Amino acid sequence: MTQHTFLVEIGTEELPPKALRALAEAFAIHISGELDAANVRHGEVSWFAAPRRLAVKVAALGGAQADSDVEKRGPAIAQVFDADGNPTKAAEGWARGCGITVSQAERLATDKGEWLVYRARVKGQPVQELLCAVVSRALGKLPIPKMMRWGDNETQFIRPVHTVTLLLDDGVIAGNVLGIDADRIVRGHRFMGEREISLEHADQYPQVLLDRGRVMADYLQRKETIRRDAEEAAKRLGGVADLSESLLEEVTSLVEWPVVLTARFEEKFLAVPAEALVYTMKGDQKYFPVYDAAGNLLPHFIFVANIESKDPQQIIAGNEKVVRPRLADAEFFFNTDHKQRLEDRLPRLDTVLFQKQLGTLRDKSDRIEALSAWIAGRIGADVPQAARAGLLSKCDLMTNMVFEFTDTQGVMGMHYARHDGEPEAVALAQKEQYQPRFAGDALPTTLVSCAVAIADKMDTLAGIFGIGQHPKGDKDPFALRRATLGVLRIIVEKQLPLDLQTLTEEAVRLYGEKLTNDAVVNDVIDFMLGRFRAWYQEQGHSVDTIQAVLARRPTRPADFDARVRAVSYFRTLEEAASLAAANKRVSNILAKSDDPVYKDLQASVLKDPSEITLATHLVVLREKLQPLFEAGRYQDALVELAALREPVDAFFDSVMVMADDPQVRINRLTLLAQLRKLFLQVADISLLQ
């Protein structure tokens, strides 16, 4: 069977660089999905993306849809004919819709009755008749948050469209997409190569653009070219390039023909904290900083031009000229900020609102000071240093440097605190209070930093929940989900002995009368436990494992973590399924019973050998398990409990729990309650599927 190559390229004005890759990947996914939905076989689907184009190429495309069998059920036989034996209007209407007469319809008999049915073999359409619609539907599904119109065109897209290329092998697919008639023309680089190229065959793409248009349409090839050339350039400078993935992706999306160049700046600027210089280079200019082997910033940077110049030195000089004033500003702000201590900036925090109902940043700083000290006393950190770090934690927001370079908050606080002669732990906490900033980010390194980081986040959680502004849907303006995960990660990964109950109560207490939500403590804890669920699911723990632990509502994160890992391990044991089923059975029996259970098991009432055996096992296990529970050794405890499988199975095989004798019945219910209580000291195993 003949196989074809299909190409679609949408030529646009410059696309948003941070969205380019996602758009191209989604375009390929939806083209593939639409072909599958249309029952058209195809091979590999490749995507291409450059600043002014999105393209997809499909290999081994079938020439037509596969033929399909159609079956349309009509009215029930009882409704097909009237009293005179003539077809009813409903039957005739259905038949007409199928293109047949009632007499031509077949009959379908089932156990529920007999119906008319139309069956036919439908020949698939030629693929060239489908592709224009396939492309239009795929474009309509792209993740575009905001559309725009251009000219007098009613069509909308993320950016104005200038060309639409639709080729099936060497032929143009006739049609109109996004208000543009399809053609075989693709556009080359604005300033190099051929401005317009007429493709002779879909297989020429993207090589013809590379050769004649000076456009590297293959996104991944372009990215790898930039990475390779930047690494080589850094080596020539005697350093290593900071090729952060996000910036590398953004730069790749900004250029069609990457040319990697190096430039330098005056060494005097190295007296400014590297973070401020890097913020300017990466954030404002999209430059790659260069570091030496020891991690010190070098007075060089790497940038990517979108053109091959006869005089690259002119481009280099231009970029050096652009960045110099920004670095000079950073130097000026840094030197000016040194004239005032961090502590002296505290009064200015009174002029900035944290939140209208929750007070100013000075109010927040005072609360963080108190809560940091409270936490420090419980985790073994230096209490005075934690309090001091908490008090100063927002002072750098009042500096010129942070006002101009907002992403340096915390980092500049650390540098200024060191300049002021604050203890190193206090200085470091200024930076680390914001950690972790994102999933996978590093945690604070000292206990003082941990105390301040937790205090800052818990103060925000308590305050925002306390005025009823918790996250709803996708809206989370105070980043409470991120703050919660940060608190949980710090406590769990640092194994800190903190309880969410008392921690939240203390954070709420420090607000005084400002909060209006009486249920704030429970609301915060419920929210945090919900984030626990999401976090452990991402780690690969099953939903029912997490639910089994959540049923016990443990509020000490380190303890919660130990329980989840214990239950996950328990699931791997041979005895797990049987004991989970037994726990579910026990739970149901106890829930349905109206009988009260005894405080203690009545040994004299035990008659059946299996219940005597189970009771004996429970007595022995209780003695053995208590120290394990107290030490939080839940995995060891569940391994011991796994030994109950045989006596539990034997009990249910030979004993009628709901005996007629009330004394025997209540005693057996007591035995089951004691069994369940042992498991519940870890988790509700009955919830395991």
Curated annotation (Swiss-Prot):
* Record keywords: Aminoacyl-tRNA synthetase, ATP-binding, Cytoplasm, Ligase, Nucleotide-binding, Protein biosynthesis
Example GO molecular function term? arginine-tRNA ligase activity
- Any one biological process term the GO annotation gives: arginyl-tRNA aminoacylation
| A Pfam family per the record | tRNA_synt_2f
Q: What class of enzyme is it?
A: ligase
Q: What catalytic activity is recorded?
A: tRNA(Gly) + glycine + ATP = glycyl-tRNA(Gly) + AMP + diphosphate
Show the InterPro entries listed in the entry: DALR_anticod-bd, Gly-tRNA-synth_bsu, Gly-tRNA-synth_heterodimer
Single GO cellular component annotation?
Answer: cytosol
Protein EC: 6.1.1.14
Tell me the domain of life: Bacteria
- Report the sequence similarity comment from the record: Belongs to the class-II aminoacyl-tRNA synthetase family.
How does this protein assemble? Tetramer of two alpha and two beta subunits.
Q: Which NCBIfam families match?
A: glyS (TIGR00211)
Protein name, UniProt field: Glycine--tRNA ligase beta subunit
- What is the native source organism of this protein? Sodalis glossinidius (strain morsitans)
